[in-house]
């Protein structure tokens, strides 16, 4: 009788353990699905914010470029215009990196290409925003 009892208890323990392992696997897979869904939502929100920010910066840069293109330009205005064009290229390269690289390298010699990529590595969002802020400040100063 003791042997039957030990076998029955062992069988119950084994089946309970198997059920708990199966439940753990199901809860882990459900957790993974939920985490993946939340990551997709976060990426979607981040992508939407980035897209809105890029669109706003592109619109602002185009407006400033049109303003500088319509009137007489000083050397300083010409430099600001060149920087705005560089900002526009950088923003386009965020959307289509392969096409932007191809477009940027057309018509340049090798030294200019090397300088372009060296400069591009040094560029970060802070200086771009500083440039746009300075351009807006100069524009408001000229208008005011």
Curated annotation (Swiss-Prot):
Residues 1-18 form the signal peptide. GO terms for cellular component: extracellular region. It is found in: Secreted. The modification Leucine amide is found at residue 143. Its main location: secreted. Belongs to the bombinin family. This is Maximins 10/H15. It comes from Bombina maxima. The lineage of its organism: Eukaryota, Metazoa, Chordata, Craniata, Vertebrata.
